[in-house]
Amino acid sequence: MASTIKKVKKPSWVDVKAKLANFDNAGLIQLVADLYAAEKVNQAFLHARFSIGGDPLEMYKKRIQKALFPNVMGRNSDVKITDAKKAISEYQKAIGLTEGMLELHLCFCEVAMDFSTDYGYEGEGFFNAVYLQFKKAVEALGKVSVEIQEDALDRLYDLRNIASNVGYGVEDDMGDLLAEANPDDERNCD
C-alpha cells in the first residue's frame, strides 16, 4: 500500500495579503506597531519610508561604516560586505530614491577604500564588491541633477585615485568606467 505524502504549501505574500484584507484600520495599525516593536530593522524601514527622525541615509551609512570599517581591535573585527550591501538593499526597499542610492554606493566605496588603505586590507572578493558598488554609482549619474552629478564625479575620481594604491587592477577598472560614462572629463587622463 502506497502512502501519499501531501506537500504543505509554503506561505506567500498572496496568503498574507488575503489575511490583511480582513483587518480594519485599527487592526492594521496594531499589526504595524507589533512589527515596529519586533525588530530594529522594521523601525529603520518605517522611519525611512515616512521620513521620520532626520536624515534617513544616516542610519544606513552607519551600518555600512560598521560593516566595512570594523574596530580591528574589537571582538567583531571582520569586514562584512554582505551586511553593507544589505543596508543598501534595505534603503532601496524603504525609499529607493536614486540620489540616496547613489550616496550609499559612494559611501560603500569610500569606507571600503579607507579601510583598505589604512589597514592594508585586500582580497579579490573585497575589491570586486567595491568595483560593483562603484559601477552602480556611475550608472546612477545620469539619473540625478547636474549638481549632484558634479559632486559624485569628484568623489568617484577621488576613489579612482585612491585605488592606485591597492592593486588588483581596481584603478584601471574604475578609470574605464569613468571614461566611458564621462568621456570629455580631463581627469580621465590622470
Q: What does each model-found stretch correspond to?
A:
Residues 5-11, 80-83:
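Short linear motifs at secondary-structure transitions and domain/linker junctions
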Residues 6, 18, 95, 99:
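Short, charged/polar micro-motifs that form catalytic or ligand-binding hotspots
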Residues 7-74:
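N-terminal interaction modules that seed assembly of large macromolecular complexes
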Residues 23, 38, 70, 74, ...:
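Surface-exposed polar/charged interaction patches
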Residues 34, 38, 46-50, 64, ...:
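Residue-level signal for alpha-helical context at structural boundaries
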Residues 65-147:
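Charged linear interaction tracts used for macromolecular binding and regulation
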Residues 131-190:
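Eukaryote-biased recognition of C-terminal alpha-helical segments
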